[in-house]
Amino acid sequence: MLALSTSCVARAGTTKFLEDYRIDFEDGYGVRSDDEEDSHAISAAKTLAAVAGSHLAPKNIGIRIKPLSTAGMRRALKTLALFVDGLHKARNAQTSGLKHLIITLPKVTNAEQVATLVEILDAYEKEHHLGHGFFSIELIVETPSAFLGRDGTIPMASFLHSSAGRCRSLHFGVYDFTSSLGIGSAGQSIDHLACDFARIWMQIAASLAPNITVSDGIISRLPLVPKENTQDAREQFGSAWRYNYQQMMRSLANGYYQGWDLHPCQLPIRHIANTVFVLRELDGAVSRLKTFVARASQASHVGGVFDDRASVLGLLNFFDRAVSSGVLHPDELLASGVNVAEVRSSI
């Protein structure tokens, strides 16, 4: 455990601290004049092209446009067009390492909105001679109508079908969803029971399509460094830090391995939560899997914990997460006697 802890800390200093980033033109951006948003879309494209492929660029990057509702569609599509065109021109003018771009679509209420975005992205790829799949999309579901239709169907499933394979994840909008249910501001938190229900519904919908992940919503209580060095300020900072950590650990335990961070102060907490989540369960998970393999994939138990094929699949999910989060390296798992690929192919 100590060796693994030391190595993962060492890797943290050599890997990108920020892995996923969205340039926001929706709620976080607010209402601006058309001229102002036009200029920001163009300048954002130039900036992205300049840093893409460098050590400054996150692994995954994209923009969040406004909703494709009747009221917002014109502005959303104009911003998208200016951004994509500006990015294309900048990529031609200077070498860019940008290999793909993620378009985040908020407040999705029907499958037609998704189909419209897909049609537009198809056209952009052809127009700018980009390979198919250069654009992928994320869908933010934040209204009750996205979870249950009047006819008893699950609209989210039709969203995924309409994405034509471009959708990579479903994201949860905490505040729009809870507001739609009549929940007051005091109850609008990421751990509200209504949010738990919604995220489970999202997991079920995501399981119907391949390679779709579910991202948790925002934690609005920010652990801002206090401006004044007073005991009260320090206590508020510590309380906010603990709250963020507890909510992130809760999300990880429930299978939501991604969430929205609004402020840089939240990033260290997320890294700590991911690391603790893996390391505190690692020894037990390794022991359970090795015992299961030693018994030729028959049911087994370690320390009173029963394992069969179904629970071992959960262990494999854990190890996949440990590697994808950067806490563990695949070679470290092999050195501990765990070969995830081999076990997965044998059960």
State each model region's role.
Residues M1-I347:
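Expand to "…catalyze enediolate/carbanion chemistry for C-C bond making/breaking, isomerization
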